[in-house]
Amino acid sequence: MSKNLFVGVDGKARKAKEFYVGVDGKARKIAKAYIGDENGKARLFWEKENTPVDYLEFVSNNSFTMSAPKLWDGTLEYNNGNDNGWTTWDGSEISSNVIDGRQRIYFRGSRNTVIRGNSASYSNPWKITGSNIECNGNIECLLDYQKVVAGEHPSMGRNCFKFMFRECSSLITAPQLPATTLAYGCYSYMFQFCSSITTAPALPATTLAEECYHYMFAKCSSLTSIPELPATTLAKDCYAAMFDDCISITIAPVLPATTLAEGCYTMMLAGTSITTAPALPVTTLVKWCYADMFWNCASLTQAPALPATTLVYGCYQNMFHNCSSLTIAPELPATTLADYCYDGMFSDCSSLTTAPALPITTLAEGCYKDMFSGCDSLTTAPVLPATTLAKKCYYRMFSGCDSLTTLPELPATTLADYCYQGMFGFCSFTTAPQLPATILAKGCYKEMFYYHQKLVIPPVLPATTLAESCYEGMFNQCYNIKPLALPATVLANNCYKDMFRYTFIDLSSTQSEEYPTPYRVPITGEGTDATDALSNMFDANGELFTGTPVINTTYYLKKGISIIS
């Protein structure tokens, strides 16, 4: 049976280039024609080869309805086989009808540059009510189908398809997205929460735009694979959260890009089930480029090599947060740090037992902030050789590391604001490292050992030049801590506030056989007070005295409590 139609022209059989049938008195062009054979079955006997499809099709075995907010800037038409042909659509609800044995609605557009655009909201995507609905064809047919037929790519405007199918759980197949040059936010949130889509469409674009794929497939819980991503030059936030919480994805994509952009991979694979991270060979980093990239990847066991030697702001921030199966951290060869570069990098990696070496002596603001917080299997801390610190450099660095037994020496003598704040909170070692600095900085030791219930021997505190909040809450809820001799005579605002709050340092205002040992602030000499310097220093501690002591006033420690000096 021939699959081409021949007609007689000038007495010769010529292959037909087009085929038309009469419908309602009008000639309609078709792509395929069927005829009944001798057994009563329909056989294809003519097919127009390479006929471009000029519509986007929604099809299901079951009836469905569609509606949408009218945000397009040209014209959209639909055809649902109701004998009206192509009808201009205003977004009001339309129903599918049986066409070629299945329920279908076709759409096409003219002179559109956006379908959703800047007025799009997550709360008003296209509404598709039904089940097991496929979307077939080229999405560009909604922009300008005539250009698609002509082999062109219609131009996309800002946020062109943003939020379009968000939360459409009945959609099982995504349309083709053949554009090669993208626009700002064009596919942002397009399929977020589409829980029935299993395969993503090809994404051939090589010229990306800011936020072009931002949250595109986030929370698509049935999505199992990631398409090739051929772009080598990235754009700001282009892949940010693209596959966030796609829990069925187990294999990471190849990332061929050689030129990164701000936030380009932020949260890209967060919450997926990948076991091995993709290679990340680029050595020229940009702000937040890998931030949160593998956040909550609980199955990740192998981290990529990170060869960059010069870091930038937040480049690895929270990169492996809560990767609970990660046991070995990658080497960190960087020689130049940047603000918040390693902030939270391995936080809550509960299987990590050994930290990477951190030999750099020139620090940056927040560089190691929260780096290992919550790593409750970590037993040995890295050497920290810096003698001059930076603001928040060690902030909460080992907070919650309750298996930590080998501590770093802390040789720094030049401190910075909040440099050690919360560094060892919620830990379990019994003896603290020494703190040799004599000139302090604002909040430098604030809450450093907060809720450290096993700490017995605190560090000697030789500083005589204090700063605002320098020791605030330092041993708060360290139940077994011993009191310290505090030599500074000139106090600072909030300097000892909450310092020994909720400990068992039991004081009395009067000396007795039960309370024999004198204790005062300062330990010797006459002190000069400051605003709230001693506020709640011993709050909720003993039965006879609790709360705020008075400077230069002698109190008495309960028998058996000795002073560390």
Indicate residue ranges for each PLM-predicted region.
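Enriched but not universal
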Residues: 1-60, 64, 556-565
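Short beta-strand segments and strand-loop junctions that repeat across beta-rich extracellular domains
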Residues: 5-8, 18-22, 32-36, 71-88, ...
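Periodically patterned hydrophobic/aromatic "hotspot" residues that form packing/interaction faces
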Residues: 5-7, 18-20, 33-34, 161, ...
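Small-residue-biased low-complexity repeat regions
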Residues: 8-11, 22-25, 36-37, 185, ...
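Non-cytosolic beta-sandwich-type ligand-binding/adhesion modules
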Residues: 53, 60-99, 541
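Structural signature of tandem-repeat unit edges
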Residues: 55-58, 90-97, 105, 115-157, ...
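Surface-exposed loop/turn motifs at beta-strand-loop junctions within extracellular Ig-like
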Residues: 109-113
